[in-house]
Amino acid sequence: MLLRGFSELLKCRGVMMKMRMKMSGDSSSLTLTEQQGGIRRIILNNPRKRNALSLQMLESLRENILTDADNPELHVIIISAVGPVFSSGHDLQELSSAEGSDLPRRVFHSCSELMMLIQDLPVPVIAMVNGVATAAGCQLVASCDVAVASEKSTFATPGVNVGLFCSTPAVAIGRTVPRKIAMQMLLTGRPLSAQQALQHGLLSAVFSEERLEDETLAIARRVCESSRPVVSLGKQIFNTQMSQSRDAAYSTAGAAMLDNLRLRDGQEGIRAFLEKRKPVWSNTDDCIH
């Protein structure tokens, strides 16, 4: 079954870590985490460095995402940030190290792994942006399944202005916004406003700063109302078929629909609809046959 293969992929990436996540008040922590009601919140917490995606920050984010990710009680992740900058991208000090240093390669590799992990994860990931997202920070927004922002937020890939073209951010951004908009961002480094980002598909929604958190949580809670394995399978198949030809995509999606029907929760949802009642999800990937 497609869903089980997806689960095995995550296990290989270390999902079986069984650490309990608690809110940390330590100002030295690069990220803060909390989980309640099926929603895990991961907060970038290095405003002094503009929440730069340093190697340490990338590793912290990866750990926060993977920890207990196979827990059926986890339904959705929200990534946000402390301060006026969501993330300024890579820490340029790490990229200006001495010749022969392996650090830049490790940074780029870790960043790419994180972006792919977000898309391979069995639960949706929501970016909640209230400020500036540039370079790899913009890449992080583009890599999330849903992205919402405040009206004051801006998005840019200004690497070209400092002599380092945003080639890896271009992978996520070029798959999210139209090609010519992506190239304009990459070639000029000029930012998009929140409304422009919404218009071109980088964002799912824009809210006032005052409403941003409540509206984001409302989206997350709506996700939590659905069966986790059904959502997981749907996310996996959506991402898979997007890179396929039309015929292959229909074949993949058709097989997924059959897999979905075999899920215990798939049958429960149909029965609940026919019986005019709310479904009682098992939130497990158990199959009925």
Swiss-Prot record:
CDD domains tied to this protein: crotonase-like
InterPro entries: ClpP/crotonase-like_dom_sf, Enoyl-CoA_hydra/iso, Enoyl-CoA_hydra_C, Mitochondrial_ECH-domain
An annotated GO BP: fatty acid metabolic process
Keywords: Fatty acid metabolism, Lipid metabolism, Mitochondrion, Transit peptide
Gene Ontology, cellular component aspect: mitochondrion
One Pfam short name: ECH_1
GO molecular function, one term: hydro-lyase activity
Organelle targeting peptide span: 1-14
Main location: mitochondrion
First and last residue of the signal peptide: none
Family: Belongs to the enoyl-CoA hydratase/isomerase family.
Function text: May play a role in fatty acid biosynthesis and insulin sensitivity.
Protein name: Enoyl-CoA hydratase domain-containing protein 3, mitochondrial
Source organism of the structure: Danio rerio
Encoding gene per record: echdc3
